[in-house]
Amino acid sequence: DNCDLSILEALQRDGRASLTDIGKGLGLSRFAVKDRIEILFRDRLILGPTVVIDPSRVGFRRTMFFEFKTNPHEPWLAEFLKKMKECDTLNGITGEYSLLGRFRIADEEHFGRILRRIDEVMTKSFFKKYRVVNAINTFKESGVPFERKAAPLTLGDIDLMILRILLNQTRYVKTPQPLSTTQISRLLGDLGVKISQPSVFKRLKRLEDQGVILRHTILVNQEKVGFKTKLVVRIKVNPASYD
């Protein structure tokens, strides 16, 4: 209903919003909001918490879109692309090409390695055809408008591990609540990194202040919410009309 949709929108804007604040705008108690969120999570409308990061701040200086022409009898190709860590989104599309993947690229050497892997696997495909689109600017992503591209930061291994955990919280949580700094500390311990909860808190705060983490949000099953189709629209504009 409308209350559920409003709760989803509130959590997409701020995945750490308090239940009391969400309830105030809906005329619901914090307990009623909590119950609704748990039902949305149980029914897989909420897939789990995550974060939106600025890729350029963590060393991914380029974003590339790859379009692949595939045969319907080649599901193995989509499985291969899903396993590539550089491919953070993959969609089936209509038209001449049937798969669209977004790849995060660190530098030319990294791009070359990705191309070699894709070239190798595409030689085994039926059509052996793909094309690359270079995104020269990112204006908005995951509902977050981007400011001008910021200079990349040199992040340590622990900071990068924290980011990976936050991006993939759906692997770790059994509730719709985002991971606490205590839970992150324990997960890092399982990975062989001994770090206290206060240290995790300080690192997380610094990543937010530096513009690495842009938003805490949730992953939503768009189809269950009612969005049956995703459209990728290409608009040809006059390059002189925007910066």
Give the ranges of each region predicted by the language model.
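A compositional/biophysical signature of low hydrophobicity enriched in polar/charged and small residues
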Residues: D1-D243
